[in-house]
Amino acid sequence: MQKAIVLGGYGLIGAASMRALRRAGFAVTGIGRSASAALQSDPSADWLIRDIPAITVDEWRTLLAGVDVVVNASGALQDGARDDLTAIHVTALSRLTQAAAGLPLRIVQISAAGVSPEASTAFFRSKAQGDAILCASALDWVVLRPTLVLSPDAYGGTALLRGASALPLLMPRIMPEAQVQTVYIDDLAEAVVAAAQGELPSHLICDLTEREARPFPELLQIIRRWQGWPAPRLHLRLPTPLITALGKAADILGHLGWRSPLRSTALRALQDGITGTPDAWEDAGGRPCRSLAQTLALLPATRQERLFARSYFALPLAIATLALFWIFSGLITLFDPARAMAILSVRDVPNWTTNLSVFGGAVAHLGLGFAILWRRWTRAAALGMLALSGAYLTGSLIVAPDLWADPLGPMLKVFPGMTLGLMVWLMMEGR
């Protein structure tokens, strides 16, 4: 049985490649740095949990022993808290190439349509640099460059596409000049298998894409109709400065661990157009990739598809709401602690308890409000908010039960916030 390893095996393309290779009879091992993401992607697969850019040449030589095919589906969109483009796209591939020298294996590189040393984004430039290192080697290699990959799994840009298409009543209109082509995930996975089985010639570089391109707003409309939503009442043109500001804000959040598809790299890539030419693929004997209409016909818009699309923006909205509430409630208390202390002092609570409750609570509010914005601590912060809210409810029953009968309902209003925190805790997961 031939052996294959897939780098980035729990990503959108990596996971599909692993499944397709197994069906084709390969013994497949996936490599990635997150054990939880690997198990969520495929709990029955063989996994090697490693940070790919940290693997040395000597370690690669050990890992490549007996391997027939390496599929490199690892990558990152933009530098951030967890990602380094040069490390993952250039350094890792350079080490892999050095280690594979002289070995009887094939490397299948998953790149991207449009990569170029002169591209407008670091993503495409670093991808091109990695491709060049592989192509300059004497190894047996194939480079596949897909356009926008559509899949049953909502992931990154295609998740945003689903969410934006499902907005109630309105349809955002952005970048009307941007042209987009798509490729079905199964077409890409079949190409990986064909390359792994030696059905494609060595040193082939080809785009994987449908032939037809369309403006991005038209793609949004097509996805909306596919999801089964009524036509929008309003087409809202988003000005370029607003889109730029959203990209900059998403870049900042990227340093807090959020891999938003709204980051400036994705927006610039969309503005440049996501297009390719399938001629090299078809000339090499590849089956023409499915059109967008054929792809969507194979992806029925189920109830869970529509539910995901409608709730896509709910999670970031909930996190932002909780962050603002907890941060500002902490600041307000610190700016006017006397009013907060009066609530306890009039009920004969000892001064030391009052001071600790007011100032300690304010600091806790600030800490939780900022922590929920840091992706690594979001779930823990949501649990902290639930715990502190529960402590407030319990304390009020002991110290100030009259607040429960207050016409403004200060204690009853705690429950919606707790529900929002619980929702964030439940919905958060790794990519």
Name each model-derived stretch.
Residues 163-183, 187, 191-195, 199-202, ...:
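A conserved pocket-lining segment of Rossmann-fold NAD(P)-dependent short-chain dehydrogenase/reductase
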Residues 4-24:
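N-terminal Rossmann NAD(P)H-binding glycine-rich loop of SDR-like oxidoreductase domains
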Residues 195-262, 273-315:
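Mid/C-terminal beta-alpha module of Rossmann-like enzyme folds, strongest
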